[in-house]
Amino acid sequence: MSRRKTATKIIDYLEKRINCENIMRYTDEYLDNNSPDKSLVIDEVPVSFTIIPYNANENYSRQLVSTEGDREDKPDFNDIKHMFDVFDFMTEANNTGFEHFPYIYGVLDCLNDIDSTVYVYYEKFDGTLPLLIDNIEHPSDWYDIVFQIVLIIMYIKYVGKMSFKAAPERFLYKKITKPYYKEYSVGDTTLNINHKYLIVCWDTNTTDFEGIQNSESSSENKLPIIDLDFLTEYINVNKDSLKIQPSNRIIKLIQEIKNQPDNIPKILVQYYGPQ
């Protein structure tokens, strides 16, 4: 079953059953006790589940209490509204064919003034990007990983018009049962990329998604900077423990992507095109 069909199935299942009164009872019922991350199994489908407490009181501001040093630092109503907007962006991307975000199966907003809670059901993945990097099986896997990360950040910035504080933990991965080649059109060149993993972007702390600054992309035709320093930093810090380190060519690719944003299409063709 495709990811989209699975999402439709679970969305329909949850809509018919879950409400603010019974959600924790259902959560206990669906809990997979054998899962290290305490995920759920709903209608035989593994599902990730997140609980987000927040303060919906109109007089509360997270930024204000953070500035004043208040011990409470819950998201406020505007934070949650922004999170819903980002979730809508992710869902629209998936529905239009850019399936590099988890499918969101259900979002339940239970308002209760200062003790409000949002419950989020979403597609389960194998783990975060660091787990994948630490356990890469073949040197060529680096090309697959870097390509997908570049696509995701470009989509967020160029299509979504948002800045994004990328970090290894904000990417999830799933190993594909049957690796496949996918065609991508870059200018006049068709790239055939071998995908062994599916990488998606996910973070419920959506304050990291903000409107892109005009200075970062001064014209509609100029590509925004794709900063992969977070990836380089992770590699440098963990290089002694990585099973398979990236080649010098991969490191050069990462550096060129950051330093030459306007040449990204040419760079991708150079590294991924016919040799």
Swiss-Prot record:
One of its GO terms (cellular component) is virion component. It is found in: Virion. Keywords: Virion. This is Uncharacterized protein R691.
